[in-house]
């Protein structure tokens, strides 16, 4: 599989980790939708990497809400999230936002795979995290030809190695992330150079 995209984070060779890429169609061409490093044991993606440009965000379709299993990951390694987490205070938080993929139904539907979700604190998901996603899409993406984004989550930190879990619709245990991050890399064609935009 291809791993040469500029924004990809470190790949893991652990048996419990699986690297997956999803593709879509942009301007009648098959292109990458996003890539992920998925934790088969804890049932969430440690990071999701994706390109962001006007070709992907052009509003040709509406939010699909096509909640479904990821066809590239074994079902028994995914949480089932048709009805959310079933616990107050947690949302099905997208790592790749639905609003970043409105160019076609296929692009948007893939953002509703259960593997793109984490158990995200509702206040965070609907508050500062949503504002951050909007800022990246509306203010930072237009500054370059392509903005490469990595969104990540961690269920352990140096200070806290204990992992909390939450249940999916059929009782599957999924790790609850303790922290999230985004890393941005912008590419502008005239200079053919990459510039680090920042770590958020």
Task: List where the protein language model places each region.
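Domain-level detector for secreted/extracellular nuclease and nuclease-toxin modules, and
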Residues: 1-200
